[in-house]
């Protein structure tokens, strides 16, 4: 996504090496990313931010996708003409996820989607993740709150010092006393 410099290695998606691809190539292949850092356009309205997520789409399709994303986050519907700068941190995170969904991704990467959010907004984000999973979207959650991400995952990967130190069934990771005590506290 152009956020970090690509130095080597391989990233494979659906049997294809996507290492070093540009953001537009990733989006065109159904991959969307929501970073941990605030990445909305503060001087644009909520609606304009959503439109930026699909500015190459035909207007009717774009409007349908915006409508679907506003249904997922009703708080945004009530603020669609407000500037993004006026939104709370939780609302900005909902907007960032909504904008990523405009591209109709098949694979969604969420980096710390609930970090520094109030419990109310955390719950709304979690509900949206569950809804997206139920729609068949593959979601990779990078999250320090392992219990939050593992509770809604099929598989879990525990990384320590930059290396995968455990992988397996998410429920097994959550319930195995040795793994849980060591990694989940």
Language-model region placement:
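Glycine-rich phosphate-binding loops of nucleotide-dependent enzymes
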Residues: 1-185
């Amino acid at each position: 996504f152009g956020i970090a410099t690509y130095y080597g290695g391989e990233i494979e998606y659906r049997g294809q090496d996507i290492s070093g691809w540009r953001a537009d190539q990733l989006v065109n292949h159904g991959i969307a990313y929501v970073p941990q850092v605030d990445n909305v356009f503060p001087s644009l309205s909520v609606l304009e931010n959503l439109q930026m997520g699909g500015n190459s789409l035909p207007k009717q399709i774009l409007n349908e996708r915006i409508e679907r994303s506003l249904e997922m986050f009703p708080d945004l519907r009530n603020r669609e003409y407000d500037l993004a700068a006026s939104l709370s941190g939780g609302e900005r995170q909902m907007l960032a996820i909504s904008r990523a969904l405009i591209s109709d991704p098949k694979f969604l990467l969420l980096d710390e989607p609930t970090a520094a959010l109030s419990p109310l907004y955390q719950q709304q984000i979690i509900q949206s993740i569950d809804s997206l999973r139920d729609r068949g979207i593959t979601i990779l959650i990078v999250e320090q709150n392992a219990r939050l991400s593992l509770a809604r995952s099929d598989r879990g990967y525990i990384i320590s010092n930059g290396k995968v130190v455990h992988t397996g069934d998410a429920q097994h990771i959550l319930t195995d006393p040795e793994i849980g005590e060591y990694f989940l506290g």
